C-alpha cells in the first residue's frame, strides 16, 4: 500500500486561553502543512511582540513553551487504512514540529 503520510488531512484543535470562546480549529492537507501552521501562529505572535524586527528567529524550546502555554492543543489526523481520524496530543505535535523544523533546516521539504 502507498505511503499516505504526506497527504494525511490534519485538523488542529486549538484553545488559546481558559475561555471556551477561544476554541478554534485549522485544517490542512498534510501533517507538514499543519506544523507550518503552528509555527506560523508562533511567528505571528513574535512579530506582534516585536514589530520592529525584520527577521524572526527562535529556538525549538521557545516553540515548545508556546505550545505548552496554550490552554489546549491537539490534532486529528486522517488514517486512510481505517477511513477515520485519529487523535494526537500536544506531545505528538511537539515531536512532529521538531522533525518538521529539522527537515527544513537541513534544506529538505
Curated annotation (Swiss-Prot):
Keyword field contains Transferase: no
Keyword vocabulary terms for this entry: Cell cycle
Keyword Cell cycle listed: yes
Family according to the record: Belongs to the E(R) family.
Subunit text: Homodimer.
Protein purpose: May have a role in the cell cycle.
Protein name in the entry: Enhancer of rudimentary homolog
